[in-house]
Amino acid sequence: MPLEGEAAHAYPPGFRQGCGADLEVTRQEVAGKTKTAPQAAANVGVRASQLSLSFVIESWAACAPGVETPQRWSQWAAAPWLPEGEPQVALAAVAPMLRRRFAPLGRLAAQAALDLAGDKRLDADADLDDNPTVYASRYGETGRCLDLLADQARGDALSPTAFGLSVHNAIGAMIALARGDRRNSSAIAAGRATAAAGVVEAMALLEDGAQAASLVVYDSPLPAGYAQFEDEPSAHFAWAWRLRKPRAGERALHLDWQAENTDDDAPHPQLPASLQALWFGLSDATELVQQADGRRCVWSRDA
């Protein structure tokens, strides 16, 4: 079904091609004093608690149960639905010894990241560009964390391997190992604003000198022990965008982020916020407004 209040929209032509950041810091309020920061390329502005960005999605990839091909994502973008079922990701491009360390969530994230990169492995002496990767997940490997807490409650010894695989940057680290990738990466979480925060992080890296940045967003439903804390629809999914700054006259996407002193969230959505962001990137919708946790995020695109 289409998102509430939105018409069905056509899917952009070409798998792994999209539309939509460049960073400009204009003015910044710090401790009641105004500081003027260096001007960059006029595609990101920061003022007090407000942030505006413009960006291009150079390529994309996505993976979810029942939505594994470009054709299925085309159908999904035209009339979104909440993916159901358990992920079945073979991850054939990853060596068996490393592949067995990936839990289902990690397999989804790895598949999206590898699809975005074209399954290309980087040799140790490869001439790498400086393009970093941002991994963004609201919950990450919460199931592994809960298992460790259960072991501790029983008085069992904690497995160093299990602990290492439970930390928030573990999935990104294993993907880097699978690809032989020694470039910069980071892992973030920001509640329902995780996808938007991932774009902000990627754009900051572009402003720091990278020519492009990859954003990998992934999540799964909370385990049963934490299910009572779910506050939005949940599903297994992962998607990846390759982001760059827009060129002069190029059609771009925009993200406006601001703090709002309100506890009133938007109506209960049909999709989790991170899947809403993917839908907006793949569709021709002109605007998507997300409001939660004291933040208001407005996604828009050039006509």
Enumerate the language-model features and the residues they cover.
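Active-site-proximal alpha-helical scaffold in enzymes
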Residues: 110-114, 119, 189-213
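Conserved "HGTGT" condensation-loop signature of ketosynthase/thiolase-family condensing enzymes
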Residues: 1-140, 144-162, 167-185, 217-303
